[in-house]
Amino acid sequence: MKTRIISGAVLVVLLILTLGLGGYVTAGVLLCVSLVGYHELAVALGVQEKNKKLGLPQFIGLAAVVIHYFILMTTGANMAAFVAIIMGLFVAEAAVFVFKYPKFKSDQLVGAVFSFIYAPMMLSFIYLLRSFPTGQFLAWLPFVAWICDTFAYFSGVALGKHKLCPVLSPKKTIEGSIGGILGSVLFGVLFGYVYATYADPNMKLQTAIISFAVITLVSGILSQIGDLIASGIKRDHDIKDYGKLIPGHGGIMDRFDSVIFITPAIYFLALIFLK
């Protein structure tokens, strides 16, 4: 527990510096985190076999991560570029599958593309949130996933009776899930007050509170789906943790799975409510 608390505190300090400085610092840190996250997920899905050298499918995937962030930093929120990099990666992986057949399996092709979309691409929306005029505030919104997780845990311990997904995650309850969503909305209300007071004084307080309550409501629901997806992948491949990078927490995907999953939704909802 002590190790978990210490590493958690260090993680928070690094987040404050990363999101506070913005620009190339934020992009650089996200790139590094994305590379590790991609590697963890790719290994879990069998794109790269454990304890084996870096294979061509994963090398191409890692190269795509670097290219994606370069494009992101030079063009910003260019959705056409997002689609192009996904298609380019798919074609490259498909070519490897065809011309190296039967060295690589079709599962590795699918896993390489899925890992890229899930970890690096979805996580990169934090950079886009940080690029908003009020990005120093908005970039923190994805971490409502941790608020949701905390409220869900304590609500489940205190009130949990009905299982949410008994096969996939036996300890999760419907009561805990509802508590997590309510905790997320409470955070959204408080965030809305802070946002209207300090980030954008021109925004009406009521509008800010309602906007962020809706954003965090959706985030609270998606956060739990993201957590269950990550758990399902681990169960399917019989692994306990995605990695060991963060002592007491596991890997990047263990700590950021829900954060990653909700970030694109938060970005697009922010475009709608804060335009």
Predicted regions and their residues:
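Juxtamembrane boundary at the C-terminal end of a transmembrane helix
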Residues: 268-275
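Interfacial loop-to-transmembrane junctions
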Residues: 235-258
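Short, conserved aromatic-histidine micro-motifs
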Residues: 200-207, 249-251, 256, 275
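Hydrophobic, small-residue-rich transmembrane alpha-helices and their short perimembrane loops
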Residues: 222-223
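Membrane-embedded alpha-helical bundles of polytopic integral membrane proteins
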Residues: 1-217
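C-terminal-most transmembrane helix of multi-pass membrane proteins
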Residues: 262-263
